């Protein structure tokens, strides 16, 4: 391939832009703490993981053997026997959520899906694409689902097989829906466990909960039927990707034979990026359980540092337990644009990812927010402090 000088100049400018902004994503959960340079040599190959990694595909240039090890790692992490599970490396959390909602719909074709108003916006798209009747449930000030409203709505709809879309770390407030309480509440209205489906959207916190001392319920042992995690968030990847995992006996119900590739396929996208499997494999092979614990503890410590800095001057900042998302009153537009802060309504947040590994990485932002809010901080409040 050969580019003109003008095109080369454009690429070089973009390179400089990326270099300048690599660590400037404090409002979004993207980790920049990764180095996959050892994998650069594989970029010359078109690696396509089309189909089921459990089977040999007629498309030889795949990374199934690496994907298989990645899925074994996550089956252990989320506490389900490897042979009882099936999942794959997706293009991101949204695809994982779609796969799980599709799976749930195939098991319960007449079910309604229930999710809180704090749920990621992708679910609104998914329910329209899959044509699943949906109910959006109120959220508590913390960002958790309103459990009573959930039960009331299910009873009002006379649903015998509801699909529950639970959050393990909401997008804006880092809140986790209590899976055990949901099951207890559903039992109280006469639903057996096999009568409904629980999906866990753990895009960010799926790589937090397994490594903290007192996790919220998050695993298959805790009662979930499927889970979706982003690979480019806590783990880190140059290409967005995700991991979705479900119970194998459920997935087998949607499996189809594809003669074109001489294999089965249960995935949403068909052709899948085989390089992502190499990224995820390299990440899990180069980190021990203790290493991941260290990364998570660092993130949570930096989140607590940020909360304390704000609270010391009277700004009502807070975070949920086991969350590296710090919520505070939204500063003025020049400040949130300068620091790429995500905001919703009257609040904004900072997400302390692994590359924000010390106070010096956060202090300039914290000071800008304090300077912006301090004249008004007595009348600005964030609802939902735990």
From Swiss-Prot:
One of its GO terms (molecular function) is histidine decarboxylase activity. Keywords: Decarboxylase, Lyase, Plasmid, Pyridoxal phosphate. Transmembrane segments: none annotated. Substrate binds at residue 120. It comes from the Bacteria. Belongs to the group II decarboxylase family. This is Histidine decarboxylase. It comes from Vibrio anguillarum (strain ATCC 68554 / 775). The lineage of its organism: Bacteria, Pseudomonadati, Pseudomonadota, Gammaproteobacteria, Vibrionales. The gene is hdc.
